[in-house]
């Protein structure tokens, strides 16, 4: 996926101010360290890339050859459906483009905010401001990043809702497709039944035709038999006439009987002919009616078959249209899913990048806070030494003010010798011993409170970082090791401090033995300072134990 940014979005003034920021080197002002620490440089300009969103729609040209056979009403309905679907797709694309533009604007805003925060961080590093400002600044940045993450989560949920809606539409189309498949199977079943009926009607017609042929043969046979019978009867009648004529002379009384017999046979022949004609006519009528009925049934079956074929063709075209629509929607859904996944991955990369930057910034802040604490300790030690020197000078001045004018030179020489010895011994001791020996208790407690506040700030920053990113097993082990090492270092420092304190006490006792006479007030002051030192040490140890607990 292409990046969200392009070069035309940035003007020359913006590049000059934020993108092309020169590298700033910050040297630590900590005494005793000569190495310089270089501050981090601003982030490079975002990689330019062009953004292109291309959408492809499935054309309806493949449906035109099949739509020519449909009615005008069906064509109008299908065109209306296609228009409504196209308008819906255009609306969805417009909505997605608007959201994409809002995402781009949000990314630019976050980048600008990041640049502003980087500039503020550089200014704060240069000024060495208080750690509390850093904390408030980064807490605000963390809140902004969390709000941005929540917005991205909400957008993701909205896109998931749209995806669920598209899936519901797809399920509806699949259900409709299944219904159309069932209706097609029903139509095919009815078509098979109609075909079976047509086949049965054709078989019945063939049987009836065969029966008609057999009946016609039977009629012809009966006609032939009837004609033969008539011929036989006529032959018998002629033979009877001949015999009657031959016997007229001998038997004149048989003519009436022959006439009666002839009349009877003629009546019987006429009756047989009439019965045969009536039976033939009735049989022919029945066969004609049955043939007409079968013809109507065959015609109805043919009409039903043609209607079923037309319906099957229409349903097939509709199924193909639904299938094409389904494929187009599936393709669109796949494209939307790919785009959403790409957007989500890009947003996740941005969030991870911001989290990494925040983590590095927090680590740098912790490092700078530690350096600040070290500098504060050095400053505190220097202030303690200055206060000790000031107190020694004030003690000398007060002591000299009460001496006589005659012993001014002697007292001044003794005090200068004592001051030289004490100053030389104080310079030999460490700054930490000087601070615990002769600095006022309220100032020491104030410095300790500042140290505790700085340490609490560092621990709070580490705790927030740990909350924002849950540590893995390896990180947890490393943190445990670091804690153990820190505890071991703290214990070693405490032991070294105790050893130094013991050595300082020994040196002080030796110096106290050497400094005899004229230093009673200084001895009392050193005793008071030692008592205050012990009290401060007890209070510091109590605070350290409470902090460890």
UniProtKB/Swiss-Prot annotation:
Region span, Disordered: 462-549
Region (Tail, subdomain A): 397-443
Coiled-coil regions listed in the entry: none
Region annotation (Coil 1A) ranges: 93-124
Annotated positions of the Phosphotyrosine modification: 43
Domain IF rod: 89-400
Any matching Pfam family: Filament
Keywords, comma-separated and alphabetical: Acetylation, Cell projection, Coiled coil, Cytoplasm, Cytoskeleton, Glycoprotein, Intermediate filament, Methylation, Phosphoprotein, Ubl conjugation
Gene Ontology CC annotations of this record: axon; axon cytoplasm; intermediate filament; neurofilament; postsynaptic intermediate filament cytoskeleton
Sites bearing Asymmetric dimethylarginine, chain numbering: 23
Compositionally biased region (Basic and acidic residues): 535-549
Region (Head) residue spans: 2-92
Region (Epitope): 381-391
Glycosylation-annotated residues: 21, 27
Major localization listed first in the record, in broad terms: other
Protein family membership: Belongs to the intermediate filament family.
Stated role: Neurofilaments usually contain three intermediate filament proteins: NEFL, NEFM, and NEFH which are involved in the maintenance of neuronal caliber. May additionally cooperate with the neuronal intermediate filament proteins PRPH and INA to form neuronal filamentous networks.
Subunit (UniProt): Forms homodimers (in vitro). Forms heterodimers with NEFH or NEFM; which can further hetero-oligomerize (in vitro). Forms heterodimers with INA (in vitro). Interacts with ARHGEF28. Interacts with TRIM2.
Domain notes: The extra mass and high charge density that distinguish the neurofilament proteins from all other intermediate filament proteins are due to the tailpiece extensions. This region may form a charged scaffolding structure suitable for interaction with other neuronal components or ions.
Protein's recorded name: Neurofilament light polypeptide
Species the sequence originates in: Sus scrofa (Pig)
């Amino acid at each position: 996926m292409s990046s969200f940014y392009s070069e035309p979005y940035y003007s020359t003034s913006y590049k000059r101010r934020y993108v092309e920021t020169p590298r700033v080197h910050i040297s630590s002002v900590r005494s005793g360290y000569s190495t310089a620490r270089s501050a981090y440089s601003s982030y490079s300009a975002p990689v330019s890339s062009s953004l292109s969103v291309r959408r492809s729609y499935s054309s309806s040209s493949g449906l035109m050859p099949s739509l020519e056979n449909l009615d005008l009403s069906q064509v109008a309905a299908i065109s209306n459906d296609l228009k409504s679907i196209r308008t819906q797709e255009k609306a969805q694309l417009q909505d997605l483009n608007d959201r994409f533009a809002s995402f781009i604007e949000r990314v630019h805003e976050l980048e600008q905010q990041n640049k502003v925060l980087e500039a503020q961080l550089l200014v704060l590093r240069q000024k060495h401001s208080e750690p509390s400002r850093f904390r408030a600044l980064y807490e605000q940045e963390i809140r902004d990043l969390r709000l941005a993450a929540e917005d991205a989560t909400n957008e993701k949920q909205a896109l998931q809702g749209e995806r669920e809606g598209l899936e519901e539409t797809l399920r509806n189309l699949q259900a409709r497709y299944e219904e159309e498949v069932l209706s097609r199977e029903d139509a095919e079943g009815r078509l098979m039944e109609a075909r079976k009926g047509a086949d049965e009607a054709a078989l019945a017609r063939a049987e009836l035709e065969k029966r008609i042929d057999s009946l016609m043969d039977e009629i012809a046979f009966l006609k032939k038999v009837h004609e033969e019978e008539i011929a036989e009867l006529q032959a018998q009648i002629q033979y009877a006439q001949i015999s009657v004529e031959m016997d007229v002379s001998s038997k004149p009384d048989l003519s009436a009987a022959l006439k009666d017999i002839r009349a009877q046979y003629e009546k019987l022949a006429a009756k047989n002919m009439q019965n045969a004609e009536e039976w033939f006519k009735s049989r022919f009528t029945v066969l004609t009616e049955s043939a007409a009925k079968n013809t109507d049934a065959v015609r109805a079956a043919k009409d039903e078959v043609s209607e079923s074929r037309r319906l099957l063709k229409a349903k097939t075209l509709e199924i193909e249209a639904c299938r094409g629509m389904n494929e187009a929607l599936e393709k669109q859904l796949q494209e939307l899913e790919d785009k959403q996944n790409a957007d989500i991955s890009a947003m996740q990369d941005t969030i991870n990048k911001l989290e990494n930057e925040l983590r590095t910034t927090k680590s740098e802040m912790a490092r700078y806070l530690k350096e600040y604490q070290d500098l504060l300790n050095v400053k505190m030690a220097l202030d303690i030494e200055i206060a000790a020197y000031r107190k020694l000078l004030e003690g000398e001045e007060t002591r000299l003010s009460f001496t006589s004018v005659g012993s001014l030179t002697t007292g001044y020489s003794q005090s200068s010798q004592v001051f030289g010895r004490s100053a030389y011994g104080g310079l030999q001791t460490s700054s930490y011993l000087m601070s615990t020996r002769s600095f006022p208790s309220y100032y020491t407690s104030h410095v300790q409170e500042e140290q505790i506040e700085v340490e609490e700030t560092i621990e709070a920053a580490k705790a927030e970082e740990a909350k924002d990113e849950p540590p893995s097993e390896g990180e947890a082990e490393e943190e445990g090791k670091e804690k153990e090492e820190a505890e071991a270092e703290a214990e070693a420092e405490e032991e070294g401090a105790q050893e130094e304190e013991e050595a300082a006490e020994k040196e002080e006792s030796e110096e106290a033995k050497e400094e005899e006479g004229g230093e009673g007030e200084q001895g009392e002051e050193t005793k008071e300072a030692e008592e205050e030192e012990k009290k401060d040490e007890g209070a510091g140890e109590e605070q350290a134990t409470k902090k460890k607990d």
